[in-house]
């Protein structure tokens, strides 16, 4: 396996950064090289709802949801690297997308 790309997404950036630090530490212990973490643009989803169920259209509330993302590239991954990644206990709030890349 030549290269592994990890894309991590979470609503809380602190949990995301702790997870990224744990992954980087585990990968470096196996001797593989890590590129990143690269902070990706934060996606903001905004929702506007009426405060009143009947009248007063001018009275509204706005909510937003921020999705933070990081990207890691693991270069020269070994079977030990893949093994250590699968054994990691990651936070359930973090969405991890793993993709094996060629050269």
Curated annotation (Swiss-Prot):
GO terms for biological process: translation. The keyword Ribonucleoprotein applies. It holds the Pfam family Ribosomal_S10. PROSITE patterns: RIBOSOMAL_S10. Coiled coil: none annotated. Gene3D superfamilies: Ribosomal protein S10 domain. Keywords: Ribonucleoprotein, Ribosomal protein. One of its GO terms (molecular function) is tRNA binding. GO terms for cellular component: ribonucleoprotein complex; ribosome. It comes from the Bacteria. Involved in the binding of tRNA to the ribosomes. Part of the 30S ribosomal subunit. Belongs to the universal ribosomal protein uS10 family. This is Small ribosomal subunit protein uS10. It comes from Campylobacter fetus subsp. fetus (strain 82-40). The lineage of its organism: Bacteria, Pseudomonadati, Campylobacterota, Epsilonproteobacteria, Campylobacterales. The gene is rpsJ.
């Amino acid at each position: 396996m030549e290269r592994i790309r990890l894309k991590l997404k979470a609503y809380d950036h602190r949990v995301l950064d702790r997870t990224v630090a744990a992954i980087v530490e585990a990968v470096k212990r196996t001797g593989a090289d890590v590129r990143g973490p690269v902070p990706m643009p934060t996606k903001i989803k905004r929702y506007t709802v009426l405060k009143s169920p009947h009248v007063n259209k001018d009275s509204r509330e706005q909510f937003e949801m921020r999705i933070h993302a990081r990207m890691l590239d693991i270069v020269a991954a070994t079977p030990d690297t893949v093994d250590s990644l699968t054994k990691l206990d990651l936070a359930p709030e973090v969405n991890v997308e793993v993709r094996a890349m060629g050269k």
